[in-house]
Structure formats: C-alpha cells, structure tokens
Amino acid sequence: MSNVETSARPFELCGFPVGLEHPLFLIAGPCVIETEQLALDTAGALKEITDGLGIPFIYKSSFDKANRSSHASYRGPGMEEGLRILAEVKRQIGVPVLTDVHEDTPLQEVASVVDVLQTPAFLCRQTNFIQNVANTGKPVNLKKGQFLAPWDMKHVAAKALATGNRHIMVCERGVSFGYNNLVSDMRSLSIMRETGCPVVYDATHSVQLPGGQGTASGGQREFVPALARAAVAVGISGLFMETHPDPDRALSDGPNSWPLDRMKALLELLSTLDRTVKASPLL
C-alpha cells in the first residue's frame, strides 16, 4: 500500500466533470422506490436544493432490495414498474438517475433507462458480475464491501476498468465493527484514490446498524452530519445519501436515512467545506 495521494482519472458523469479538481456532486434519494409520487416529490425537492447550491445531482432509488434482513420485508415494486418510475423522474424532473443491480438483473434493460449503475457492497468480489455491469458501458458506482480492506478496492476497480469502461467510481460505506455495527475509517477515502477512480462516500449506510432490529437494520442518523463533514474534509469527489420525507415511516433503511427537510442545511455546510478543501492542494 502506497502513501501517495493519487489523483483520479477525470471524466464526465451525466454531463458534469468529476474529480478532486471539481465541485462535490450528490447521489441522493430514498433507499427503495415506494410510490411514483414520492419519487417525483423527493427528486423535485432535491433538484431545487442542489440547483440553488450549484451541486451536480443524481437521483437514486432501488426497484429491488435483494439483501433485506427478512424475506417478509418490502423489497420494492420490481424492475418493470421501478424502471417506469425512474423514467418518469428523468422526464418530469430532468435529472439523471441511478439504481443498483444484482447478478440476475437483465443489465441491458436497466441500462437502457438509467444513467448510472451501482453494484451492491455484498457483491464486490463477484468478478463476472462486476465485469458484466461495466460492460454495459454505463458509469458504475462500485460499493466497497463492509468486509473489505480499502486497499483491496483496487482489485475490484481493476476488474471493471479491464472491460475498457473508464467511467468507474468507488464508494466507501463503512466497515464491520463487531456484530450489528459499522464504523468509518476516514483513511480509506485517501487509500481508495489509489484505484485511480473518483471516490464517493456513503454517509447514510455508514451509520447503519446491520440487522440491529432483529428482522431489520437499525441506524444512527444523528451521526450523518459528523461523518459527512469528515469525509468532505478528507477530500472526495461525490457524496451518497439516502433521504426520505418521513424517515420513520420509510419502507427501507429509515433509521439511517436523513430527513429531506434537513437536506438543504446540511448540503449548504458541506458545499462550503468542499470549496475550502479543494481550494488548496491535498497534502
């Protein structure tokens, strides 16, 4: 493992430049697609906030949460209905969209609708899966497994980059710390730059308590601002956050989702911090 601060390959993502020389971008939305109206309302509110702050924005939501704690938990509307709703978000709100895919997902069908594909953390070691997703040619956000050392993400990124797809990002979402708990090692954000890919920090899954409620995961959303500030202070290209108008009633990951009505205040702070950090060379 090197101590060298490696700059990511700059590239255009959904029409805006990404990298440490460019402003922080945001990937945000509810964990899972609940209703079309909720998706449109949330995307519209986030677009208004980010437009006002000059933050590039990608809307995210899942049509199938395949790794829920319980088989009885809500997984989403399914691919056909989920893609229809995401297409409506693109059409009506005018923002790019991201969703996660799985080993049995018809990748080309999803890629025909969404702008960015995301690979789940639990699947980061699956070589065929990672390369099949990258082979769609779409930008890919590679989630780091909760079990994986940050320096091992270079192997995951290399698998994706070997396909010829240069639009690859790596995402930190916390590391297992005993049972039912995650912590964020901020050193990983610097280490993961050695992949040569833009680094994204997932500020909401990082406060998740996996399986902490028995048949569902818990979370400590009160720590989202502290961890998000720390990550931006280290220097990142993008921030990933799950948000919901009423997190306590969200159908998935409510305990670690940030309230939509508090997004503007947090993003104002983070945007200011990002400009300060990127005004000088990283040490």
Curated annotation (Swiss-Prot):
Q: Which pathway does the record list? A: Carbohydrate biosynthesis; 3-deoxy-D-manno-octulosonate biosynthesis; 3-deoxy-D-manno-octulosonate from D-ribulose 5-phosphate: step 2/3; Bacterial outer membrane biogenesis; lipopolysaccharide biosynthesis
Q: Which InterPro entries match?
A: Aldolase_TIM, DAHP1/KDSA, KDO8P_synthase
One GO term of the cellular component aspect?
Answer: cytoplasm
Catalytic activity field: D-arabinose 5-phosphate + phosphoenolpyruvate + H2O = 3-deoxy-alpha-D-manno-2-octulosonate-8-phosphate + phosphate
Pfam family for this entry, one: DAHP_synth_1
Write the record's keywords in alphabetical order, separated by commas.
Cytoplasm, Lipopolysaccharide biosynthesis, Transferase
> Keyword Cytoplasm on this protein?
yes
The enzyme's E.C. designation: 2.5.1.55
Any one Gene Ontology MF annotation carried by this entry is:
3-deoxy-8-phosphooctulonate synthase activity
- Coiled-coil positions are none
Q: Which is a GO BP term held by this UniProt record?
A: keto-3-deoxy-D-manno-octulosonic acid biosynthetic process
Question: What domain of life does the native source organism fall in?
Answer: Bacteria
Kindly list the places in or outside the cell where this protein is found, as annotated in its UniProt entry: Cytoplasm
Q: Which family does it belong to?
A: Belongs to the KdsA family.
Q: What is this protein called?
A: 2-dehydro-3-deoxyphosphooctonate aldolase
Q: Which gene encodes it?
A: kdsA
